Amino acid sequence: MIIRSPEPEVKILVDRDPIKTSFEEWAKPGHFSRTIAKGPDTTTWIWNLHADAHDFDSHTSDLEDISRKIFSAHFGQLSIIFLWLSGMYFHGARFSNYEAWLSDPTHIRPSAQVVWPIVGQEILNGDVGGGFRGIQITSGFFQIWRASGITSELQLYCTAIGGLVFAALMLFAGWFHYHKAAPKLAWFQDVESMLNHHLAGLLGLGSLSWAGHQVHVSLPINQFLNAGVDPKEIPLPHEFILNRDLLAQLYPSFAEGATPFFTLNWAKYADFLTFRGGLDPVTGGLWLTDIAHHHLAIAILFLIAGHMYRTNWGIGHGIKDILEAHKGPFTGQGHKGLYEILTTSWHAQLSINLAMLGSLTIIVAHHMYSMPPYPYLATDYGTQLSLFTHHMWIGGFLIVGAAAHAAIFMVRDYDPTTRYNDLLDRVLRHRDAIISHLNWVCIFLGFHSFGLYIHNDTMSALGRPQDMFSDTAIQLQPIFAQWIQNTHALAPGITAPGATTGTSLTWGGGDLVAVGNKVALLPIPLGTADFLVHHIHAFTIHVTVLILLKGVLFARSSRLIPDKANLGFRFPCDGPGRGGTCQVSAWDHVFLGLFWMYNAISVVIFHFSWKMQSDVWGSISDQGVVTHITGGNFAQSSITINGWLRDFLWAQASQVIQSYGSSLSAYGLFFLGAHFVWAFSLMFLFSGRGYWQELIESIVWAHNKLKVAPATQPRALSIVQGRAVGVTHYLLGGIATTWAFFLARIIAVG
């Protein structure tokens, strides 16, 4: 008799052909909802169609189907991203002066867009140097392309075609994994496996392959470029990859191959994996050998991290165990139950991811200027300002999104009957203490931060400069910030003995780096002016958090409306006969939070723009004398509200206001148009629904008189729809106005 060990059961993780592919169904507007699919009775139908198209929760309550829809939509998103990237590379290949810029990046400005001569628009094609006329771009693509070793427009064409292939592949994957082989719910909930694959695969192998590309392709090509070799004379990427002797001429350790690696004599590789710190004086960017070293180190960390979690083999961490063991002395059951929340509520999961990614994006904004990663990025002031502003806005939106989805989780997915005495339950039970304390902090910060400015304006108006808070009168030095700067400046040789220079020139202690007689970076001094505006930052951030957190903690119930959870995520008021209950839904808190996020980020980007023009950016003479763009006026001018209005907003708006008739005139038109878009928003925000309904009814009467009445009954926007349209135009108008103001200014003077 043969005894066989039982065969291990193979888990089937996908359903085959679960949903048929039907273009007839998709062609029907609102096919995802019985009500909407019936077609329009009133004009509200089109708004509901847009509001619910991506609200998968409203299509079905089946978590598996919702998960599959989200998964499939992600592939669609990736497809759009590849298409967009492909377009960027195509513009670089077809409409740009990339090759000219590559040969002289200090005198030629990047341009990848040429305007057609229709109705005189060719005025927008400014002279960017090198005999090329086009629109100056500030996206940083040229700098990324140079850093990655792209030396010709042909290579950009090839990459653009590759992007299109990947876009098609992603579209196919989105269809395939919903209609042909759709993963089961268990697959989406297998977090350990997901962590292992994402950490080791995406982040680990991704970083490793990028490090490999940098070592074998970017470093040698950039070494030639920095030495002034004509891009057409530089060997092509595959020659470096296939011919080791070619690399060994630049980096001698390549001649020894992998021997130093396996004999643990890693120091041999120090010619291309460095730990220098600071900036390359030729390009004003981080040392590319430092960056390659960084990606190799990150890859090792993530490859290890991707083998830490317990899957089919009984070793490693289980997330559920980690969470349930996470108990503090004052937190009751601690994180018990969070595992179930995060594997059954994608809103809860998304909320955490948005909060993390939003914070990370803001961190990226701050590192792009203080540690500029790409060659010739630091001296391209327009790109520096654009990258900072862009990443700040994106980070702000993501963080508000985190609060929005946390509130949706509270309303739709939170089950109070199964949660007792865990962390979330405890936070909810003393939410009054949290919100009232936060409210007190906001009042304190608001009065004190603004009060310092009002004091200065008053003293300035009364002609008493000696009584102002300033670096030359009553000093309020940011001593903690200065201490942090100093600690980092002194780190090489003390806490970071391996590093030659500090992580960033901004800490101080070093000399400035100039490229082509322009300042790339220098130690940034902090004084009373920065102390004042930093407290405005603290104030606006805390108010944003107050509004958003109150929305989350009171999403299900409040003293005013105990049954709020039954009313849903967004509702205008608690029904007729209950006055004073409007604008209390979780959605309304997100709506209000967006305005304060806009306030907060605006002050940050204004601070950055002025500070850099005043104290960092500028030209340097052959004698070594630095002339800053605004001549260091930040310290004395930004300490009054009047100074911000007069010396920043008004003084620096002259370029955009006077741009008519020049190649910057598009920014002048955008400045005007975006102000109009912003003003248009006020019509939605300050006006009641009834006003519009009355107006519509008299317009309908006129149509009836002329027998041209539509079949679909016109309706005013609901209160929530009106506020949504209002906040959208407010933010769009405000951001586009700022964009035009910043770019016209910095392209003209930078």
Curated annotation (Swiss-Prot):
<keyword id="KW-0812">Transmembrane</keyword>
<comment type="subunit">
    <text>The PsaA/B heterodimer binds the P700 chlorophyll special pair and subsequent electron acceptors. PSI consists of a core antenna complex that captures photons, and an electron transfer chain that converts photonic excitation into a charge separation. The eukaryotic PSI reaction center is composed of at least 11 subunits.</text>
</comment>
<keyword id="KW-0479">Metal-binding</keyword>
<feature type="transmembrane region" description="Helical; Name=I">
    <location>
        <begin position="70"/>
        <end position="93"/>
    </location>
</feature>
<keyword id="KW-0472">Membrane</keyword>
<keyword id="KW-0004">4Fe-4S</keyword>
<keyword id="KW-0148">Chlorophyll</keyword>
<dbReference type="GO" id="GO:0016491">
    <property type="term" value="F:oxidoreductase activity"/>
</dbReference>
<dbReference type="GO" id="GO:0009522">
    <property type="term" value="C:photosystem I"/>
</dbReference>
<keyword id="KW-0150">Chloroplast</keyword>
<keyword id="KW-0813">Transport</keyword>
<keyword id="KW-1133">Transmembrane helix</keyword>
<dbReference type="GO" id="GO:0009055">
    <property type="term" value="F:electron transfer activity"/>
</dbReference>
<keyword id="KW-0249">Electron transport</keyword>
<keyword id="KW-0460">Magnesium</keyword>
<comment type="function">
    <text>PsaA and PsaB bind P700, the primary electron donor of photosystem I (PSI), as well as the electron acceptors A0, A1 and FX. PSI is a plastocyanin-ferredoxin oxidoreductase, converting photonic excitation into a charge separation, which transfers an electron from the donor P700 chlorophyll pair to the spectroscopically characterized acceptors A0, A1, FX, FA and FB in turn. Oxidized P700 is reduced on the lumenal side of the thylakoid membrane by plastocyanin.</text>
</comment>
<feature type="binding site">
    <location>
        <position position="691"/>
    </location>
    <ligand>
        <name>chlorophyll a</name>
    </ligand>
</feature>
<feature type="transmembrane region" description="Helical; Name=V">
    <location>
        <begin position="346"/>
        <end position="369"/>
    </location>
</feature>
<protein>
    <recommendedName>
        <fullName>Photosystem I P700 chlorophyll a apoprotein A1</fullName>
        <ecNumber>1.97.1.12</ecNumber>
    </recommendedName>
</protein>
<keyword id="KW-0411">Iron-sulfur</keyword>
<feature type="binding site" description="axial binding residue">
    <location>
        <position position="683"/>
    </location>
    <ligand>
        <name>chlorophyll a</name>
    </ligand>
</feature>
<keyword id="KW-0603">Photosystem I</keyword>
<feature type="transmembrane region" description="Helical; Name=IX">
    <location>
        <begin position="589"/>
        <end position="610"/>
    </location>
</feature>
<keyword id="KW-0408">Iron</keyword>
<feature type="transmembrane region" description="Helical; Name=XI">
    <location>
        <begin position="724"/>
        <end position="744"/>
    </location>
</feature>
<feature type="transmembrane region" description="Helical; Name=X">
    <location>
        <begin position="664"/>
        <end position="686"/>
    </location>
</feature>
<feature type="transmembrane region" description="Helical; Name=III">
    <location>
        <begin position="195"/>
        <end position="219"/>
    </location>
</feature>
<keyword id="KW-0560">Oxidoreductase</keyword>
<feature type="binding site">
    <location>
        <position position="573"/>
    </location>
    <ligand>
        <name>[4Fe-4S] cluster</name>
    </ligand>
</feature>
<dbReference type="GO" id="GO:0016168">
    <property type="term" value="F:chlorophyll binding"/>
</dbReference>
<feature type="binding site">
    <location>
        <position position="582"/>
    </location>
    <ligand>
        <name>[4Fe-4S] cluster</name>
    </ligand>
</feature>
<dbReference type="GO" id="GO:0015979">
    <property type="term" value="P:photosynthesis"/>
</dbReference>
<keyword id="KW-0157">Chromophore</keyword>
<feature type="transmembrane region" description="Helical; Name=II">
    <location>
        <begin position="156"/>
        <end position="179"/>
    </location>
</feature>
<dbReference type="GO" id="GO:0000287">
    <property type="term" value="F:magnesium ion binding"/>
</dbReference>
<feature type="transmembrane region" description="Helical; Name=VIII">
    <location>
        <begin position="531"/>
        <end position="549"/>
    </location>
</feature>
<feature type="binding site" description="axial binding residue">
    <location>
        <position position="675"/>
    </location>
    <ligand>
        <name>chlorophyll a'</name>
    </ligand>
</feature>
<comment type="similarity">
    <text>Belongs to the PsaA/PsaB family.</text>
</comment>
<feature type="transmembrane region" description="Helical; Name=VII">
    <location>
        <begin position="433"/>
        <end position="455"/>
    </location>
</feature>
<feature type="transmembrane region" description="Helical; Name=VI">
    <location>
        <begin position="385"/>
        <end position="411"/>
    </location>
</feature>
<keyword id="KW-0934">Plastid</keyword>
<dbReference type="GO" id="GO:0009535">
    <property type="term" value="C:chloroplast thylakoid membrane"/>
</dbReference>
